[in-house]
Amino acid sequence: MSKKTIANLTSADLSGKRVLVRADFNVPLDGDGKITDDTRIRAALPTIQDLTSKGAKVILASHFGRPKGQVNESMRLTPVAARLSELLGQAVTKCDDCIGDEVAAKVGALQNGQVALLENVRFHSGEEANDPEFARQLASVADLYVNDAFGTAHRAHASTEGVTHHLSPSVAGYLIEKELKYLQAAIEGPQRPLAAIVGGSKVSSKIGVIETLLDKVDKLLIGGGMIFTFYKARGLAVGKSLVEEDKLDLARTLEAKAKEKGVALLLPSDVVVADNFAADANAQTVSINNIPDGWMGLDIGPNSVKEFQAALSDCKTVIWNGPMGVFEFDKFAAGTDAVAHSLAAITETGADTIIGGGDSVAAVEKVGVAEKMSHISTGGGASLELLEGKVLPGIAALDEA
């Protein structure tokens, strides 16, 4: 899907125009209401600065947390407005609501190149319900629309889909443009060999993506808690490891499908097991054929790491979604760390590496190699759905290029 982007709009299109920008400012705060990681705010700057430099009046909208349609004082966007003011080097006008007379007055007072931030759109139940009247009110203070919130693009909400019925043009910002470029290219026309590494605890949450990837990839590497469902399906003893009993047939089907399509499906040959689920548990490395009763697998083992590294060494494109083990516990982080370092190394030799949202992003940041990847997706659910080939409502609603 080729969409019109902010790059298609000139100063003549934008000067003096009121532009509603849907951003994703859902950043983590500490107990004192201080922002602990401003990555998402910084990620929106190229779009905001492009608009202000072309003389637009920028109206920023975002959700924050899950206030469930009620005003929640701890979920106001005030800290975001303060951080944005610092990063942009100009005062950002903060509104106390996202619709109504106060918003209209503050937006009306903006000069060309100035920025206003609306209050948390989820303080109104009409946002997540995609209520047409709420969408109309939200859009009423603007002339055109830019969506730069990839993380919510898989939801049809008022600020991601509803407003596009009232504002034209409706285009993608630079963040969404980059997401589409990397994620779609990886699926539609990748440099080969193409490998996908899928981790995480449950097969059930990744079924769609694994099935789609089996039609596209040359190699599929599986780690994380979901491996034990595959082992049990093969008839192996898995101790107290996590197993989805109702997905054993599915695991067999996926293995058969990989074989039929000529996809190299790699499961770990050894695992690090623990006597309980804790950071200080006793741990040992065992072959997958020798998992002891009463123990649970919490990471892939050193032999598996070597096998995975060998499989990735000649790949030209790699998509990674989901950790190899319980990387939050240092004792069970080695597999995830090793995969992160391997991807950083092959990126240096020209491979495209795409970190597909969620826990894998936290993992590469923890290891300190985030900067070395080709692309880090800002959307967890959205990137998975795009990789599954689903249509994202927030993207579909934008103007065609």
Curated annotation (Swiss-Prot):
It is an enzyme of class 2 (transferase). Keywords: ATP-binding, Cytoplasm, Glycolysis, Kinase, Nucleotide-binding, Transferase. Its EC number is 2.7.2.3. It catalyses: (2R)-3-phosphoglycerate + ATP = (2R)-3-phospho-glyceroyl phosphate + ADP. Its main location: cytoplasm. It is found in: Cytoplasm. One of its GO terms (biological process) is gluconeogenesis. It comes from the Bacteria. Substrate binds at residues 24-26, 40, 63-66, 122, 155. GO terms for molecular function: ADP binding; ATP binding; phosphoglycerate kinase activity. ATP binds at residues 206, 297, 328, 357-360. Monomer. This is Phosphoglycerate kinase. It comes from Acaryochloris marina (strain MBIC 11017).
